[in-house]
Amino acid sequence: MSLSLFGIILGLVLLMFLAYKGYSIIWVAPVCAVVVAVLSGYAILDAYIGDYMKGMADYVLQWFPAFFLGAVYGKVMDLTGSARSLGNALVKLIGPRFAVAAVVIPCLLMTYGGISLFVVVFVIYPMGYSIYRAADLPRTLLPGAIATGAFGITMTAVPGTPQIQNLIPTDYYGTTTMAAPLLSLVACAVMLLPAYIYLEWRVRQSRRKGLHFVPDPKHKEVDHDSKALPSWHWVTGIVPLVVVVLMLNLFPWLLNRFAGIELASNYAIVIALVGGILVACLLNLNQAKTLLPAINEGANGSMGAIMNTACAVGFGSVVKVVPGFASLTSIALNMPGSILFSEAVAVNLLAGATGSASGGMSIALSALGPKYAEMAAGNTGVLEALHRIASISSGGLDTLPHNGAVLTLLAVSNCTHKESYIDICITTCIIPLVSSLGLALI
């Protein structure tokens, strides 16, 4: 093992350990990046001011509008009582027994509708908070449910999902987003069912221990009296959600169909979120005094979330430029076994090393894709299987403690790694990892 590869492993382990212990990723990530750089013989200032800051800044440049608007949307829904009304209505409709499903299903629908998982975290959390309060469940169980719905099958396995993890393989294998539908459906079953069973087991475990919902001291929510709100107020929670999904998917199509304009996805999500915010505000005009404070709190809250994520991305940027990363890539690409198994291992390892599903998969496929496409010799079935295994594998080791989505989810929910990461790890890391490797061996 080269010293540089050892540095990557040491830096990664240190990053995960300190993040799990609750230390701020804002200083932990650059320190761990420096460890990687020093052991790789890389200039410290070049690594920090150059590669680290560039990776961090590029991420903020790309994602800040979505984080900002997503946080504002979530806070408007929260402080106006719309999220609470919708959450209470869902609990009344299906009962507190199915509180987990009431959180997981909306996450699945929104991510399958094309909404970024980062945005879903901001949008769903206020509603989930209300659902878990109404069901008297520990709020520390909520991140696991959100992660299961947002970071799982609709990100990688469901046929036709518009998430980037399902789009990247099409460039390498000439496939479509519907690739390997049967394999995809099997993957959905073996990933979602165990995850849901686990979450329900955690609920039963918490009830046996006598645990209850404990309000988050940092969660500022107007104490709306349910009797003071009209019985139809839950509509103010569901309509903005529908508007966001429809605008994200329908508006770009209409623009292209009738004006010949191709709207970029990052522009589309901004327009959709602005539409959702405006509709939420219009439906709650009777609470006009609440709206500006909600927008202000949402804007402030978005900064911490995106900085946590961007710092983790900066660490991955340093890892990718040191010599040891080439060694890691070589190990991943030369795994014994079938091409499907080799691909599954490679994508998982590189997604874990970079802390990014799309980043790890892009690196793996840029090296593996042409080679495997050639080995498939035009066999459509094999190419589609390669597509699906790559996509599913990207959602395995990516959700280690330093993953940006994990950090965002924990920051938004004000939970620590120690309190909630185990549920995220089991449902979005261990189960997808085992599933991807198992399916690759079939």
Residue ranges of predicted features:
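Hydrophobic transmembrane alpha-helices of multi-pass solute/ion transporters
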Residues: 1-72, 85, 89, 93, ...
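Long, contiguous bundles of hydrophobic transmembrane helices that form the permeation core
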Residues: 2, 39-40, 182-294, 408, ...
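Short helix-coil transition sites and intra-membrane helix breaks within transmembrane domains
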Residues: 22-25, 60-63, 74-84, 111-123, ...
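Hydrophobic alpha-helical transmembrane segments of multi-pass integral membrane proteins
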Residues: 66-70, 93-130, 306-314, 328, ...
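Re-entrant/interfacial helical elements at transmembrane boundaries that shape
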Residues: 71, 85-87, 119-131, 160-172, ...
